[in-house]
Amino acid sequence: MSKTRGSLFVRLRRLALRAILAVLGVWIAGILLFSVMPVPFSAVMVERQFSAWFSGDFRYVAHSDWVSMDEISPWMGLAVIAAEDQTFPEHWGFDVAAIQKAVAHNENSRRIRGASTLSQQTAKNLFLWDGRSWVRKGLEAGLTLGIETVWSKRRILTVYLNIAEFGDGVFGVEEASQRYFNKPASRLSASEAALLAAVLPNPLRYKASAPSGYVRARQQWILRQMRQLGGEGFMAQHKLR
């Protein structure tokens, strides 16, 4: 009996190890492949789609339309950097100062403040499931290091802008621009880009199509930050265009 149990344990352990290695292989292949190829869909898109189907909503479709950085207004890249990660060109995937501030804030507040960089958000949205856990955070850190090592900053920003969620079923800046402004992403103004960036903390709660007072205030704050960073010159200076 003990031999049978031991044998079963060994088989299960081998199976688990193979599964882990297979997932790691897929992630490594994805990092290498998506360094040059358009991303057809992200883990978040798949999760949202299956969640809708399982809840009986068969009308939901996760829409996305890949575009290159040359087809995205420079204001859009600047807006998300101003809103989400102002040290994006300098760090290697993690903003240590922001993490320290978030930890100090979270120790004394009920409202949780995040400190994820654009690189971390890209890794999470592209490869991982939604939610909060130490396991997911650990995987996110490893994947972030992977894309920071293999991809350029321009590539990270390109992928981020193409898979970010901007509303219910709206993924990527091209889809968002067409949906909310009836124009391609290449023609977004600074104000429109700031409005899209303003909903990114919670695109299912905040609406670009019907912006609340909070979203409008955040839009104006983002515009001020964009000017302080140096406007379009910031993007050229850091070779993000």
Curated annotation (Swiss-Prot):
First-listed, main subcellular location of the protein, grouped into a coarse class: membrane
TM stretches of this protein: 19-39
Subcellular location: Cell inner membrane
Reactions it catalyzes: [GlcNAc-(1->4)-Mur2Ac(oyl-L-Ala-gamma-D-Glu-L-Lys-D-Ala-D-Ala)](n)-di-trans,octa-cis-undecaprenyl diphosphate + beta-D-GlcNAc-(1->4)-Mur2Ac(oyl-L-Ala-gamma-D-Glu-L-Lys-D-Ala-D-Ala)-di-trans,octa-cis-undecaprenyl diphosphate = [GlcNAc-(1->4)-Mur2Ac(oyl-L-Ala-gamma-D-Glu-L-Lys-D-Ala-D-Ala)](n+1)-di-trans,octa-cis-undecaprenyl diphosphate + di-trans,octa-cis-undecaprenyl diphosphate + H(+)
GO biological process: cell wall organization; peptidoglycan biosynthetic process; regulation of cell shape
EC number annotated for this UniProt entry: 2.4.99.28
A GO MF term: pentosyltransferase activity
Enzymatic class: transferase
Keyword Cell inner membrane on entry: yes
Pathway(s) per entry: Cell wall biogenesis; peptidoglycan biosynthesis
Alphabetized UniProt keyword annotations: Cell inner membrane, Cell membrane, Cell shape, Cell wall biogenesis/degradation, Glycosyltransferase, Membrane, Peptidoglycan synthesis, Transferase, Transmembrane, Transmembrane helix
Family annotation (InterPro entries): Glyco_trans_51, Lysozyme-like_dom_sf, PBP_transglycosylase, Pep_trsgly
Bilayer topology annotation: Single-pass membrane protein
One cellular-component annotation, GO: plasma membrane
Role description: Peptidoglycan polymerase that catalyzes glycan chain elongation from lipid-linked precursors.
Record-given protein name: Biosynthetic peptidoglycan transglycosylase
Organism: Cronobacter sakazakii (strain ATCC BAA-894)
